[in-house]
Amino acid sequence: TEGLPVRAAAFTNLSRDHLDYHGDIANYFTAKMRLFSEVVDSDGAVVVWADAGEYSARVIDLARERGLALLTVGERGSTLRLAERSPGQLGQQLIIEAEGKTHKISLPLIGAYQAANALVAAGLVIATGGDVSTTLGNLSRLQPVRGRLERAVITQSGAPVYVDYAHTPDALEAAIEALRPHCKGRLILVFGAGGDRDTGKRPEMGAIAAQLADNVIVTD
């Protein structure tokens, strides 16, 4: 991205990944911050998911220091405030407050993190000139990304089977917690952590699986 003019960039969150390259989470965050400190144009915009704690606050501070246009989204957001989220059978209902108006959105995606990603994406559209009402209205037309809480099949007993790319502790936790509100019976998890790049995440993922799923099957 260093050779490209970037009008707007977004920060969602930071979780354990790529530590085989960066060494620790602090170095990883420093590398991510270069997007906002060096790559975004001086007259550009930054969209921040405001609910990621210290990391969100640090990106917000940097955007203000550089004088960039700042849009914040989420429950603590001021540009797009997530006032309410209600999970349904095939998606979720969102109530968004923006520009003094309340918008009711039927989002055909499962999980809190997918609502977060959708709002951050909407923020990027708005930051680059999109109309707020039109942008939020179009969220109801989104389609799930393959391999991201993708419903693969429904078994003969009526149980839906979902496939997700989750390969970090945070991602696994988010996927299970996203599915739990839609689960009427047992939640059965099949997962693995192959390869030798970051073996330190395996016990964390195992603990999350044991705590949040009803049955766990570990693959090799």
Residue ranges of predicted features:
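Short, flexible loop segments at the rims of nucleotide/cofactor-binding pockets, characterized by
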Residues: Y21-A26, A166, A193-R197
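Generic hydrophobic secondary-structure packing signal
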Residues: Q114-N117, T134, H167, A171, ...
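Active-site beta-alpha connecting loops in nucleotide-dependent enzymes
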Residues: P144-G147, D170-E173, E177-D220
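Switch II (G3) loop of P-loop NTPases
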Residues: V161-H167
